[in-house]
Curated annotation (Swiss-Prot):
Organism for this UniProt entry: Aquifex aeolicus (strain VF5)
Keyword annotations: Cell membrane, Membrane, Transmembrane, Transmembrane helix
Topology of the protein relative to the lipid bilayer: Multi-pass membrane protein
Protein name: UPF0719 transmembrane protein aq_1349
This protein's GO CC annotations: plasma membrane
InterPro entries recorded: DUF350 (IPR007140)
Bilayer-spanning residue ranges: 5-24, 37-59, 69-91, 104-126, 130-152, 173-195, 210-232, 245-267
A Pfam family that the UniProt record links to this protein: DUF350
Keyword Transmembrane: yes
Domain of life: Bacteria
Subcellular localization: Cell membrane
Length: 268
């Protein structure tokens, strides 16, 4: 019962924090239900899924004060992580403005990144005797994970010859979906790497995480080449995504996410 009450408080608290930090000028209910803003709905859906995944992995009741403290830390980390990603990788566009004007590509980009970061946070969170120690360990792994998300997105942007920033701004939903699948795939790999058995040393654990990431990127590229040049030789999938062909983006998205699970199988 206490877990349910804590979760209820956390969801309500997180919802209002999200509204204030991201969309304080907008009337959320009117945007979603009155204006039928799909972009904002996608962003919200990803946010709540990210919260739920974090709660599932982080919550372990010890004391009311301690659990509330942990969950507030997770909420702010989730919001801060998405803000930093927007600031660094999508710095040329105002994602909030794009979402409010109904750009579904911007909405799915932010929504999937919320989910990806929720998965990453749940893997990165280390429950130690000291709250401060828990925060430090968690931030080390989370920071490493965010750097890897950025590197992977940059790498695939070059490989596919797609400027994701420009495509999101142009309301290219297909490109946004591919971008989301890349971040989701990497977060799944990192979840498997970080949440595995502790190797007895922080340095060894960090090295193992980097190794997982490198293998995942190699496999992601190999799978892309196989799908692009062997399975679908008569079309250039990346060009189709550029033309906002949703069918092509679904093929590529499935390829990137599948490569993540195969990485876990190979490395496991």
């Amino acid at each position: 019962m206490s877990g349910f009450l804590i979760a209820l408080f956390w969801v309500i608290f997180s919802k209002y924090v999200f509204d204030v930090l991201f969309f304080r000028e907008a009337k959320i209910e009117r945007e979603i239900f009155g204006n039928k803003n799909l972009a904002l709905s996608l962003s919200y859906a990803g946010y709540f899924l990210g919260l739920a995944f974090s709660f599932y992995s982080v919550y372990f009741y010890e004391s009311l004060f301690r659990e509330v403290l942990y969950l507030i830390f997770v909420s702010f980390t989730l919001l801060l992580g998405v803000y930093i990603f927007d600031l660094i990788f999508l710095r040329k566009i105002d994602l909030k403005e794009e979402i409010l004007r109904g750009n579904a590509g911007a909405g799915i980009t932010q929504g999937i990144y919320f989910l990806s970061l929720g998965i990453l946070i749940s893997a990165s969170f280390w429950r130690k005797e000291s709250f401060i120690l828990s925060v430090i360990y968690s931030l080390i792994y989370l920071s490493l994970g965010m750097v890897m998300l950025f590197i992977s997105t940059l790498l695939m942007s070059r490989l596919l010859k797609l400027n994701f920033e420009e495509e999101v701004k142009k309301e290219n939903f297909s490109a946004s979906l591919v971008l989301g699948s890349i971040t989701l795939g990497v977060s799944v790999v990192l979840y498997g790497a970080i949440s595995g058995e502790f190797m007895g040393s922080l340095i060894f654990d960090l090295f193992s995480t980097v190794l997982y990431f490198v293998v995942s990127q190699v496999l992601m590229v190999i799978f892309y080449v196989v799908v692009e040049f062997l399975l679908f030789r008569k079309v250039i999938l990346s060009s189709e995504v550029y033309e906002n062909n949703l069918s092509a983006s679904l093929i590529l998205s499935a390829t990137f996410i599948a490569s993540a699970f195969i990485t876990l199988a190979v490395m496991g």
